[in-house]
Amino acid sequence: LCFSTAKRILENGQIDPEDKNNIGKTAFDIAMEEGARRIGALLSGQDPETDELSALAGGLNVFQALWYKDMAALDAILRSGVELQTICEDEKLHDFKGKSPLACALSWDNAEAAEILLRSGADPDFRDSEERTAFAVWLKKRKQGSEKKEECLHLLRCLMQCGWHPENPADKEGNTSLSLACREAGYELGNWAVRYLVENGADVNAVNLQGQTPAMNLYGGRFWDGNIPCFAVLPRSYPYGGRCCTEEDADILEVLLEAGADINAKDKWGNTLLHYIAGSSQRGAKEAVGLVMDFGKPDVNAVNNEGKTALDIATEKNDESLVKFLLKYD
């Protein structure tokens, strides 16, 4: 009845479908929100009585279907053929702005939609307006909850099966997917991803544009512009110290070390893994350095471009236990 009424009104030209109500919504906006897909199709200029796919899609685009979590509409849109290597430009879909359809599905924990998009041709390596892959966006969800583990691992497998190249840059800093996962290792999704990627042959020594390895990113690696203030009293940043590490990070470090992580690699500013560990936090730093020692002989006297050793950084942070530990090898 509602559809027939809407059709007659449109045919009679009694209203302008682009008119807005007092809160700025068009008839199509309301049809989208209320799930009136046949009316939505009609308002978008389609004929839902003769076109089955348009009746299901309701005039929605792929981002709108994801926003309203309408799987029937999404399926119809995909069956009708749609470009999936694109980004959302709709200001109304604020949480999707600038993201790809796959990234939108992953960031909203819509595993079913993510898999359908992948099977329909979404490119896992496509980068959005901020040069992030869908995986990079997904990591920022910082998922917790062990009940999600199998779902996450299933999606990681789907990404691989659908052409994902995790060794490719996943962001504008040139980080691989493993490096980004290491940055998010304080959360279960990051931990699961690190283990999965290493088990599937990820390069544990791949460096980003700053020369940071996955292990360095695990221990607080972050973007740094290299700026050092002229006066020591002025605030400054460092390439390390990007996250507060804990004793639990040693488990992930061990995974990287067992896979052959280079313990003497240096970033573009001369910092080694020991510099990063010393700059990360006081929790677990001593244990992490001890673990590194178990896998080789790192150069504890290595100095960065500012002339600092890991011991110097530990001293600046008043990490007494790490200072005492490093002095044994000085």
Write out the residue ranges for each language-model feature.
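Ankyrin repeat boundary/linker residues
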Residues: 21, 55, 88, 95, ...
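Ankyrin repeat domain, specifically the short helix-to-loop turn at the C-terminus of the second helix
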Residues: 7-16, 42-49, 75-84, 88, ...
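Intrinsically disordered, low-complexity regulatory segments in ankyrin-centric signaling systems
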Residues: 41-80, 96-99, 107, 115, ...
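Asparagine/serine/threonine-enriched low-complexity, disordered tracts
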Residues: 14, 21-25, 168, 175, ...
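Ankyrin repeat A-helix N-terminal signature
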Residues: 1-2, 30-36, 64-69, 104-110, ...
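Intrinsically disordered, low-complexity repeat tracts
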Residues: 1-2, 8-12, 22-23, 29-33, ...
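Ankyrin-repeat-protein effector appendages
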Residues: 30-68, 162, 259, 315-330
